[in-house]
Amino acid sequence: MEFLVRSENRLPADFPAERRAELRAGERARATELRSAGVLKRLWRVPGRNATVGLYEAADPAELHDALMSLPMSPWLDVSVEALATHPQERT
């Protein structure tokens, strides 16, 4: 299944800079792992916001949930998920 995942980082502005840097590095590393595993297909930034839009592939919603919760910043992410269905024009 493919999923469109929108996430906005809600890390507090006064969060310690050193810890913020650690989380960002961990987030980058985990995203690379998810990409290598074929779970994270595409990732875009949203201009003007601390937000991303990603195309993920997982066997089911539970597997996607596990992948998203494995992100180091997951406690501070505001996430919305839309399951995607193939459009008839894409089936040819």
Regions found by a protein language model. Give the residues of each.
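Conserved, structured core segments of small domains
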Residues: 1-92
